[in-house]
């Protein structure tokens, strides 16, 4: 055996066979795409186009896009940005946006500290309201008070445990209705 055959037997890779037309398969520049413009676009999209360095690119170099700011304008813009930053920091620290509070956050602590005072039971009356509207509102208040007194009296009179006789037939009816529905649905 020759040395070459021994290497193949040991499991080493064979050298790649070169094709004569290999340059044709890998060359994008030789593709026939029509005119030169389409060819350049294709090469640019495929990333195979030749890079042409046109010189140093400076952002804002074009006269139509560049404008010069005065020192006063720069100061004004930086003040506005700083003010916006402070507002966002204050709002995030004050608790207005509590979406991302992290571990250990408890809503109950903050609500006890910053709970707004309860609204007054009777709002102050406006001078522009007529006396008839005041009379109507006072009648509604007295009616609502009497209704709430009747409800509390009715609650006290109701028995705490329902009668077993009343609840038992209802549960049996519910079971029989369920069975009948099941029988009807499977039978048809």
Swiss-Prot record:
Q: Which PANTHER family match?
A: SMALL ACIDIC PROTEIN, SMALL ACIDIC PROTEIN-RELATED
Matching InterPro entries, A to Z?
Answer: SMAP, SMAP_dom
- Compositionally biased tracts (Acidic residues): 130-152
Domain of life of the native organism: Eukaryota
Q: Gene encoding this chain?
A: smap
- Annotated signal peptide: none
Region entry Disordered, spans: 1-188
Query: Polar residues bias located where?
Result: 83-95
Q: Where is the composition biased (Basic and acidic residues)?
A: 49-82, 153-176
In Pfam terms, one family for this protein is SMAP
User: Taxonomic lineage per UniProt?
Assistant: Eukaryota, Metazoa, Chordata, Craniata, Vertebrata
Give the source species: Xenopus laevis (African clawed frog)
Spell out the family assignment given in the record's similarity comment: Belongs to the SMAP family.
| Record's protein name | Small acidic protein
């Amino acid at each position: 055996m020759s040395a070459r055959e021994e290497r193949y037997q040991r499991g080493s890779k064979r050298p790649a066979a070169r094709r004569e037309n290999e340059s044709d398969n890998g060359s994008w520049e030789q593709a026939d795409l029509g005119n030169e413009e389409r060819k350049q676009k294709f090469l640019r999209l495929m990333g195979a186009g030749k890079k042409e360095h046109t010189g140093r690119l400076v952002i804002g170099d074009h006269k139509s896009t560049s404008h010069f700011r005065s020192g006063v304008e720069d100061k004004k813009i930086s003040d506005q940005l700083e003010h916006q930053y402070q507002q966002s920091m204050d709002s995030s620290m004050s608790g207005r946006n509590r979406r991302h509070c992290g571990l250990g956050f408890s809503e109950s602590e903050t609500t006890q500290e910053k709970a707004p005072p309860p609204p007054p039971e009777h709002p102050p009356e406006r001078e522009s309201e007529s006396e008839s509207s005041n009379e109507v509102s006072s009648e509604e208040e007295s009616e609502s008070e009497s209704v709430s007194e009747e409800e509390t009296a009715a609650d006290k009179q109701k028995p705490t445990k329902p009668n077993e006789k009343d609840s038992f037939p209802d549960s049996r009816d519910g079971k029989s209705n369920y069975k009948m529905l099941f029988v009807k649905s499977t039978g048809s």
